[in-house]
A protein has these predicted regions:
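Bacterial N-terminal signal peptides that target proteins for export
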Residues: 1-8
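Intrinsic low-complexity, intrinsically disordered segments enriched in polar/basic residues
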Residues: 3, 19-20, 185
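N-terminal, post-signal peptide beta-strand-biased segments of exported outer-membrane/organellar beta-barrel
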Residues: 8, 18-136, 150
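Catalytic cores of large soluble enzymes that bind and process phosphate-bearing ligands
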Residues: 5, 101, 192, 196
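Outer-membrane beta-barrel porins/channels
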Residues: 23-40, 44-45, 108, 114-304
């Protein structure tokens, strides 16, 4: 006999995994306040160059140079899903549907440090290379509701057998049979994600002459993430708003037997080399920095 709860949980985990990895890791590039004034920083000769143009920092004056930055960021992300069975959600019978998430990062710290001596420049940079905050979807995700909608479709296919327990709604077209008389569905859902990718880079630049300098360094990244979400109170809705909880079909003695909850931590780290070059002549300055791909292996730990 198939365990319905295990099937639902597997579907939810698959859906959340797709959601978590679809966008990949987005590298943050606003690692200095100067970026907010002008985004073209790749040829700058200043302390922010520790991140944007490390080779060019070698042309700064001898001594210690330090920049400390604190920023705040917020964002609203909207995901649209047009799954046809969403029309059977009695709380919101519409499709396409928009799922809105709000992200807020009160403090995004970073610092750049350089010590220049003669032709050498020794540098360090700390930042949030990726992530930096939390995002909440108060009504869950479309991928979550798709699982519930498919369960609703299963309930409609069983309507001839369930009608004695839960009378069908004569005003609903049954998606399984194409005839009038079916069930809607209802549920509660929530999703929250948190990502922090801490980056620390160290390296040295060497001024070959008054026009040319080169840089070599390494960046280490430590990742810590958490994803929490749930789908609860799944029920079929029949005539006059009557409900049949899914839990009565899974384990009638446990009202939470059909609830699905996900709470997963991810941690990992990686290292990557960085190289750079800067050439200046007169009023012109040309520079390039290449940061190799960072290979990271994230370890998953399911809390529940």
């Amino acid at each position: 006999m198939i365990n319905l709860k295990n099937v639902c949980l597997a579907a939810l985990l698959s859906a959340s995994a797709v959601t978590a990895t679809a966008g990949g890791l987005l590298t943050n590039t606003n690692q200095n306040i100067a970026f907010n004034r002008m985004m073209s920083r790749e040829a700058s000769i200043g302390i922010d160059g520790v991140y944007y143009n490390p080779a060019g920092v070698a042309f700064m004056k001898d001594g210690h140079h330090l920049s400390i930055n604190l920023q705040t960021a917020w964002q609203t992300r909207t995901i649209e899903n047009d799954y046809a069975l969403f029309n059977y959600n009695v709380k919101n019978p519409t499709t396409p549907r928009k799922f809105e998430g709000k992200a807020f990062a009160p403090v995004i710290p970073s610092f750049q440090y350089a010590y220049n001596k003669n032709r050498w420049s020794f540098q360090a940079n700390f930042d949030l290379a990726g992530g930096g905050g939390k995002c909440k979807f108060d009504n869950g995700l479309g991928s979550f509701e798709k699982v519930v909608a498919n369960i609703g479709f299963l309930g409609n296919s069983l309507a001839p057998y369930l009608n004695g327990i839960l009378p069908v709604n004569p005003n609903i077209a049954n998606p399984a049979t194409g005839t009038m008389g079916g069930y809607g569905y209802t549920y509660d859902s929530f999703m929250r994600g948190r990502q922090y990718y801490y980056g620390l880079s160290v390296g040295a630049a060497y001024r070959i002459n008054d026009h040319l300098s080169v840089f070599g360094g390494v960046r280490g990244i430590y990742a810590t993430c958490n994803y929490y979400g749930y789908v609860k109170n799944i029920a079929f809705v029949g005539n006059n708003g009557a409900k049949l909880p899914l839990s009565t079909m899974v384990d009638r003695n446990d009202p939470e037997s059909s609830d699905i909850e996900l709470n997963t931590d991810q941690t990992g780290y990686g290292f990557t080399p960085i190289i750079g070059i800067d050439y200046k002549t007169g009023r012109w300055n040309f520079s390039a920095k290449y940061e190799f791909k960072t290979r990271m292996r994230l370890k998953n730990k399911a809390v529940n």
